[in-house]
Structure formats: C-alpha cells, structure tokens
C-alpha cells in the first residue's frame, strides 16, 4: 500500500512519485490550497493539494485530525523561504495527485494541543502511542533489544527460554498466582525472575545464557516500578565477579554509544559502605557534587545532646552536608527542608550558614552556634571544605536515619539548586553489600536473594557470624538509578542449606520449596554468577523520561490496573467453579 515512510522522505526523493500511508496530524485549509501534516511511525511530512487535482482537493476538504489515509503524489523541494528547519522532512513536500480516506476518526478523547492527564493517556493508549515522542521511545526500546541480542550472540551467549508457569519461591515480593484446573487447590506462580532456572541451566552445562524476559511482582508500585516488567537476564559459569562485570559493562557502554553517541568510559567501583558513608545511598547519583562528611569525633564533648548523643553512640552518626551557595536559602526554605528530612525519620535539621569563612565562629549564622567553640567551628568548616556563601546541614541520629535523611536531602537540594549536572552520565558499580539485613523481627533477611554467595567465608564461618558476611554481589548504577544487579551464586549444597537456616527456613521447608535445587547441587555444580538488567529502566534513561510507563507500550497504573482493558476484572462463576475457587468477600466495617 505504501512505497515510502512519511518521515524518511528527503531531497534525494525529489521528482519521485511516492505512495504514503498514515494519519492526518494537522490540516490547514487555505481555500484553493489545502496543506496537511501527514504522520506515520517514522515522522511527519507536509502534503498539499492544489486546484489542478480537483478530485483530490475536494476530498481533502473532508479531512480531520487522525483520519487514516493513503496519498499518492510527487516529492518536490520547498522554496528556500518555506524550508522548515525543525522538521527532518522540512526541505521537501509532497504534491498530492490522489487521496484515499481509509478510515475516518470520531472526535478525539485526547487533545493534541494540550497536556492530557495520564489517566486519559492510559485509557486511550492506542491514540497516545501515535504521538511522535511516544513512538520514538518504543522505537528506541526495539533498537536496544536488537543491540542486546547481537552483543550477546557475539559474546557466545545462548538465548534460552525459561517457564512462565512455575513454583512459588520466596524472592522478596508477593507472587502472582495462577490456579491449576487439573490439580485442584494447587497454584502456579508467575516468575519474579528466572533466578533458579538460569542457575539450573548452568548446572546443565550451558555456561553462557541470556534471555529478554517478562517478570512479575505483586508489590507496591512507584514511578519506576510495574507489576510486570522486562529483564535482560544473564548467567555465566566459570567466570569471576570482575569478569562478569567487565562483560556487562561492555554491553551497557555499547548501548550508550549506539543509542546516544556517548562513550561512558570505564565505570568506577565503590563499596556499599563507601556509598552509604559518602552519599547516604547504595545507588548514588554521582552527577551531584555534594557528599556527606562525618563530624561525630568533633562533637563528642559539646553540651548539645542532639549532637553529643549520637556522636558518643557506636550505632549513631553525626554527618554534615555542605551545600555550595546554600546560604541564600530563606528561613522558610530551611524549615521546608527540615520537614522533608522528617519523612526519613530525622527529628530536625541543624545548620550553619557560612557568611565569612575567614572569621570562623564570628562569620557564621546558626541556631546551634552557642553550643560550639571556635575550634570546633573551624574544624567543621575545614573538614567540609566550606566557602563563603555555603550552607552546612547536619544529620544526627542512628546511622540508617542519617544516611536516609541526608541522602534524600542531598538529591533534593541537587535538583532544587541546580547543583546536579543534568547533562552528564555518571555510571558506577557498587559492590560488597552486606549479605543479610535485620528483618525488624529479630531475624535476618537476604539483602539480595538467598542464592547469593558470601565473599571469602566457609559455611561454618557464615553460620557463626552471619551479620559479618559480605555478599559477593554487585549493582550497576547510572545517574542514581539501579539499572542492574547480580552476584556470584552459591554452588555448594552445604553453603546453600546454611543460608536457608540463617533465614529461618527449616529443613522440611527447604525440601518442600527448594528440593530440586538442593538435589541439583549434588551433581558437580560449576561456579556460576550472573546479573539482570531492568530493560524498562535502561530505556527510560536512554530516552530521557523519568516515568517508566512512557517506555512500555501498555503499562499498568500505580494501582496495578490497565485503564484501557479494565484489567483486572471479575471472573465468571463457571470459570471459578471449574478451578475450584471460591471468592470470599471482606466484611464491611461498620
């Protein structure tokens, strides 16, 4: 039906007769001439109808936005004064000789000239996806997956599919369950990741595996989370953690070079402890120049319990955050930031305004100045590198609250005061995570998942001191987003059972949930390691949006619903009966 795409016409096509198919993006009726911007997935081209082709001109008078049409015409160069430098096709236009209206469009529920609500965009997603910026994002996503497949093929990885209907295993979030009609009362689980299957593939001898795969997690959603999402899933045998990182870093550098024309360079490597200490986050945004600086040793003797308490507590921390140019902040802004850190458990926000650095105590303005000596102020200013016009904010509490509160404040100030370099790419690897963390109920939970191997520990050493264990794990972070994470896996049955025991999984439960894995570990399991990237998150970064729904064709809302199809929906009673399911309604509160 077409010979060319609208958006691909150039001066090289001048004089050629072309047939185009697409939609009316805009129409301008000048009486004797009608101009339309005609759009397809590749872009927009100007088409015009003149009186010499009366039939086509007459039919063109009926055109409205989003009519689906076919046009045949001749490509012409525009006069110099009419060249549109803002359009890829702005040097040419098409003189139409014939027009076919394939399908008309009713009045549109989306307004092309105004910002539509996200609710409307999701309900009429098929119209929203016609917008050039949305089409471009999905084209970029397709390019990314194509680049990934070629790269992985070139590096000897095999694309192997793993099951969608599988067994529920604890991986940190709730499973989506699928009832079995054949096995009444039993349920499959949709995979949160192909974790165990890809490990089993390593045990099967396929030493380099990858898959671009759908995963499902029934969890509370955020702007960068979806109940169903896509992973670039990777596993290798006989490779160390640094070797895995080297290959995966090369993949991501390849993507940025091909999609953005940017060489990311070598990725720095930072330990979890250093990231938390300097940035208050295990996914630091290195575009932001501000860092947390420990000052507890300077404040142990002050007569100000807010500082002295945490400064003398082994589990406490006092840290300072220097904000370049922050002395300009108003009292209201400071109060607003004080309320902001309370969201993260902080009780408030002490500060020092640095007016004249050289004057020390006399050159600052601070509500806590009366508790500080000149020597202490000089030491704080020296350690933080403060300059005239800077602000220093303090966090004083337990270590987690200080990291969370000042880490979040650092990001907010970086954005609010334009301190974060939005034109920069800042990738890094974060390694050496704690293997376990407190579950809040006196037990331990795996920081990543229960199949991650510890670094340099035997099973007996791990059992004796699990809280000291460091995971042989690694996360890739770009501009403050965790885009991928992985680890070296446990390949020894004793170690795996030890980890299960630390997590409170007894032997009977181990057999019920992981018997197949424990059996497989008995038969010459190779050392293996892997990683998974979030394709949606990578695409989000590469297309410059901050909403993951913008890079998924048909996403869910933050309530895990599809507004277009109205999923989820109620099942009919006959289907439920056949599955042996009875729906129990919650009693209404009186």
UniProtKB/Swiss-Prot annotation:
Residues 195-198 are annotated as: Aspartate. It is an enzyme of class 6 (ligase). Keywords: Aminoacyl-tRNA synthetase, ATP-binding, Cytoplasm, Ligase, Nucleotide-binding, Protein biosynthesis. It catalyses: tRNA(Asp) + L-aspartate + ATP = L-aspartyl-tRNA(Asp) + AMP + diphosphate. It is found in: Cytoplasm. Its EC number is 6.1.1.12. GO terms for molecular function: aspartate-tRNA ligase activity; ATP binding; nucleic acid binding. Pfam families: GAD, tRNA-synt_2, tRNA_anti-codon. L-aspartate binds at residues 171, 217, 448, 489. ATP binds at residues 217-219, 226, 482, 534-537. GO terms for biological process: aspartyl-tRNA aminoacylation. Its main location: cytoplasm. InterPro entries: Aa-tRNA-synt_II, aa-tRNA-synth_II, aa-tRNA-synth_II/BPL/LPL, Asp-tRNA-ligase_1, Asp-tRNA-ligase_1_N, Asp/Asn-tRNA-synth_IIb, AspRS_core, GAD-like_sf. The keyword DNA-binding does not apply. One of its GO terms (cellular component) is cytoplasm. Belongs to the class-II aminoacyl-tRNA synthetase family. Type 1 subfamily. Homodimer. Catalyzes the attachment of L-aspartate to tRNA(Asp) in a two-step reaction: L-aspartate is first activated by ATP to form Asp-AMP and then transferred to the acceptor end of tRNA(Asp). This is Aspartate--tRNA ligase. The gene is aspS.
């Amino acid at each position: 039906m077409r010979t060319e795409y609208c958006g691909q016409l150039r001066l090289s096509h001048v004089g050629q007769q072309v047939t185009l198919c697409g939609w009316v993006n805009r129409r301008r009726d000048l009486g004797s001439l009608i101009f339309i911007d005609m759009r397809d997935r590749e872009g927009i081209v100007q088409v015009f109808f003149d009186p010499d082709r009366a039939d086509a001109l007459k039919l063109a008078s009926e055109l409205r936005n989003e009519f689906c049409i076919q046009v045949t015409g001749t490509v012409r160069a525009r006069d110099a004064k009419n060249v549109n430098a803002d359009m890829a096709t702005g040097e040419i236009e098409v003189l139409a000789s014939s027009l076919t209206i394939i399908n008309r469009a009713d009045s549109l529920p989306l307004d092309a000239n105004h910002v539509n609500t996200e609710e409307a965009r999701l309900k009429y997603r098929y119209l929203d996806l016609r917008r050039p910026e949305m089409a471009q994002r999905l084209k970029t996503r397709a390019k990314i997956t194509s680049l990934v497949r070629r790269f992985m093929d070139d590096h000897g990885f095999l694309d192997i599919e793993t099951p969608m209907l599988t067994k529920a295993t604890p991986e940190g979030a709730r499973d989506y369950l699928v009832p079995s009609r054949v096995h009444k009362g039993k349920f499959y689980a949709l995979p949160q990741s192909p974790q165990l299957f890809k490990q089993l593939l390593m045990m099967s001898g396929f030493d380099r595996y990858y898959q671009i795969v759908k995963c499902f997690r029934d969890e509370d959603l955020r702007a960068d989370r979806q109940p169903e999402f896509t992973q670039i899933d990777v596993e290798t045998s006989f490779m160390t953690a640094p070797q895995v990182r080297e290959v995966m870093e090369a993949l991501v550098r390849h993507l940025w070079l091909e999609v953005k024309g940017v060489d990311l360079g070598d990725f720095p490597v930072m330990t979890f402890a250093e990231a938390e200490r300097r940035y208050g986050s295990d996914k630091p945004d290195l575009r932001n120049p501000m860092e947390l600086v420990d000052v507890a040793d300077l404040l142990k003797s002050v007569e100000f319990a807010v500082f002295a308490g945490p400064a003398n507590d082994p589990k406490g921390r006092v840290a300072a955050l220097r904000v370049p140019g922050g002395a300009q902040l108003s009292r209201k802004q400071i109060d607003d930031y004080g309320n902001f850190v309370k969201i993260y458990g902080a009780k408030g926000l002490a500060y020092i305004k640095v007016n004249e650095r050289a004057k020390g105590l006399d050159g600052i303005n601070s509500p806590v100045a009366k508790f500080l000596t000149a020597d202490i102020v000089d030491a704080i200013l020296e350690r933080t590198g403060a300059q005239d016009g800077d602000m220093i904010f303090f966090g004083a509490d337990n270590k987690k609250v200080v990291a969370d509160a000042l880490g979040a404040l650092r990001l907010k100030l970086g954005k609010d005061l334009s301190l974060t370099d939005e034109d920069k790419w800042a990738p890094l690897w974060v390694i050496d995570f704690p293997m376990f963390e407190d579950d809040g109920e006196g037990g331990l939970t795996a920081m990543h998942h229960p199949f991650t191997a510890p670094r340099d520990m035997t099973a007996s050493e791990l059992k004796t001191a699990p809280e000291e264990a460091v995971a042989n794990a690694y996360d890739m972070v770009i501009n403050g987003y965790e885009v991928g994470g992985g680890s070296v896996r446990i390949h020894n049955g004793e170690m795996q059972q030890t980890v299960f025991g630390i997590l409170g999984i007894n032997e009977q439960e181990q057999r019920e949930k992981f018997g197949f894995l424990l059996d497989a570990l008995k038969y010459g399991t190779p050392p293996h390691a892997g990683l998974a990237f979030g394709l949606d998150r990578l695409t989000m970064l590469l297309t410059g949006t901050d909403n993951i729904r913008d890079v998924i064709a048909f996403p869910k809302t933050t309530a895990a619903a599809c507004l277009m199809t109205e999923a989820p929906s109620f099942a009919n009673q006959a289907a439920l009966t056949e599955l042996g399911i009875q729906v129990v309604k919650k009693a209404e509160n009186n």
